[in-house]
Amino acid sequence: MNAAGGGSGSQAAGAAGVNSSLSHNALLSTASGATTMPMAQLADGWLELESDPGLFTLLLKDFGCHDVQVEEVYDLQKPIESPYGFIFLFRWIEERRARRKIVETTAEIFVKDEEAISSIFFAQQVVPNSCATHALLSVLLNCNENNLQLGDTLSRLKAHTKGMSPENKGLAIGNTPELACAHNSHAMPQARRRLERTGAGVSSCRFTGEAFHFVSFVPINGQLFELDGLKPYPMNHGGWEDSEDWTDKFRRVMAERLGIATGEQDIRFNLMAVVPDRRIAITHKLKMLRTNQAIVSGTLQKLLKADEQGESGNGDSQRPDTPTTLLEPSAFTARDLQSLLKNLDTEIAINEQHLADENDRRHMFKVDASRRTHNYDKFICTFLSMLAHQGVLGELVSQHLLPSKKVSGQGAANRISKQSTTASAGGSTTGATASTPKTQQQQAAAAKNGKSPSKTPGRRRKGRNKCRKRK
């Protein structure tokens, strides 16, 4: 915590090193000139983001990295295809409570060598509420550029921060307008109001015990690194066996972290994987399947045509030349090719459905983002004012309050009915004795003679029996 919460003096010095040519009140603009933001709002104006894979996927696209998506991991044992890294979200107060248990372990795996630290992208979180962007950049900027297209913004950031200290890298992230604007564009309106109420400089992601925090797990040079912007150094969890994948090592680390091995599952967490865009692999597979479909279909047509010519008596007809070495006419009959073509059609239909599902997911990501970021305050206030102007607001409020009153009235009625039921049940014991035929005859005779019926005939009867016994 002390390393993450750097003082204002070190922050000013780092900011001077990163943006020495810009004044504090200057306007920063992107390379295209479309995005402008006051310098004073960059480091202090970052907003909280939700932990949502759709939000993170759209955020990566806004960063300029288009061939990547983020998926939520529900089962650690389920294999994940070609992940770039993992983002682990946990409750910061719970990590702080468990600090005594893991402080010795983390101290042993800290990488304190400056040369080793400068060779990787590790940035300390010195800007409030930027942990989500930090986690994404810790994965992307430590990946091989041959396997991932970072885009102009991230490529410039990676080149600009090469050789910087972790603190200055964190300041460089916070003072990049493209990242700040993309980050804040996915925040809910409530996050902006909270920031305005509490004032800048206080990070709920860093200091509030009820907040959550993001950290990244990424393979670097055959070692599994944990990159936490609130820690002073990166953590090296070591390598993995030659017969293993790096995700196997990650599963063991997470199992120990979450207490799954010991049964202590008391940490609320969320796990997401940064993976290649699934649509790219599906599109490539569809292209291959359609190519094979065309080859098989063409070969089948030529084979059937040759068989028809042979049946018609044309002895000079030859077997067709295949367009590929994968299919030899002597190895496949017409029935085999028809069966293979049917399987290809099925595979194509399945992958087309998968591609449509992925596109629908992307569309829903955008719909959810619009709903998440839209400010409904003006609409609600205008709608209520129109109802009040038409004179129907009070009636609607009364109608909505009536069910609660009915419920309370029903509760009182139920209590009264219970009391009456209890009273009638208590009197039913005495009434049962008085309602017997013999007792009714006695009451009728007493009424005829002008005498009041006895209230306790049972007791008098017992007394007479005792007197008779004494005699």
From Swiss-Prot:
Region listing for Positively charged C-terminal tail required for binding nucleosomes, in residue ranges: 405-471
InterPro entries registered for this protein in UniProt: Papain-like_cys_pep_sf (IPR038765), Peptidase_C12_UCH (IPR001578), Peptidase_C12_UCH_sf (IPR036959), UCH_C (IPR041507)
Composition bias, Basic residues: 457-471
Region Disordered: start-end pairs: 410-471
Molecular-function GO terms, alphabetical: chromatin binding; cysteine-type deubiquitinase activity
Main location: nucleus
Gene Ontology BP terms: epigenetic regulation of gene expression; heterochromatin formation; protein deubiquitination; specification of segmental identity, abdomen; ubiquitin-dependent protein catabolic process
Subcellular location: Nucleus
Active site: C131, H213
Coiled-coil boundaries: none
Keyword Hydrolase: yes
Family classification: Belongs to the peptidase C12 family. BAP1 subfamily.
Protein name: Ubiquitin carboxyl-terminal hydrolase calypso
